[in-house]
């Protein structure tokens, strides 16, 4: 419980110093008690660089800078204009799921841990990342397959991303529960529902087996179509 509370304070400070709370306040008037909490926790460190844009652009920039959990939160809220309004939802659709790639040596450590030392010996070469998003990144690689070399693409989850995501969502759920049960006006924001659905959606996204199964199904459905090529997983 103490760990969740500490993480909650870290997140609250991020939200406030990034300008996200000020932006939300322009669209949904946040209860005075919550505003006071965020004001106190961010004394002397507020980001003022976002004030020239409209609220939706401000929120996009703030969430983009806060990492995976908040990028996903923004993308989810873009599908819920009933909660944040049509205009802000449209602005959040522009939120880019792009973050800096993690280092190649970290990618190699993750692969070795997942497939084991013996299977790892079949990898001849792993290239630098060619695409990076908040949850995973992709590398081209060369592997040994039945005494032949084969070019493949490997998608790798970010190191410790599942633990980080679930820790931050646990803290957000605690915050949502406290707010909904102590401030009657906040119930209309459906904070607990938002956090719960975000957890479900992103946990599915982090299980790459679902993506692999969908890709294999697409391959089977299109393998006889001329001019259409889906890589096998």
Regions found by a protein language model. Give the residues of each.
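Core mixed alpha/beta domains of very large multi-subunit molecular machines
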Residues: 115, 214-215, 229-232
